[in-house]
């Protein structure tokens, strides 16, 4: 018998996360490592768990995640979006609740490119009046 699972893709900044949701006990595995080991900061772990806590599903699913690209914050945000999308695939009634909390929205902010003749994207050389 095939294992029933729900899938969700999440992206944030330059990070991508593929999230698989299966019935289970609440284990979250990111790139074959437990969540607590993968993310050193408590903030990142909290971000990942937000959709589950909101829908009261912390102990109902085992979550398998493949995250790539970007840094810690970007990956945490990508995983959060992926979990939210997978939860909606599992139960459509959760969508309005997750949307209201802002977990269904893709954060479209990306790094602005560095411009020629400037130090950074917007930082110009110091201006001297005289």
Swiss-Prot record:
NCBIfam families the record matches: PRK00132.1
Annotated family: Belongs to the universal ribosomal protein uS9 family.
Keywords: Ribonucleoprotein, Ribosomal protein
HAMAP family in alphabetical order: Ribosomal_uS9_B
Pfam families in the cross-refs: Ribosomal_S9
GO CC list: cytosolic small ribosomal subunit
A Gene Ontology BP annotation from the UniProt entry: translation
GO molecular function annotation: RNA binding; structural constituent of ribosome
Protein's recorded name: Small ribosomal subunit protein uS9
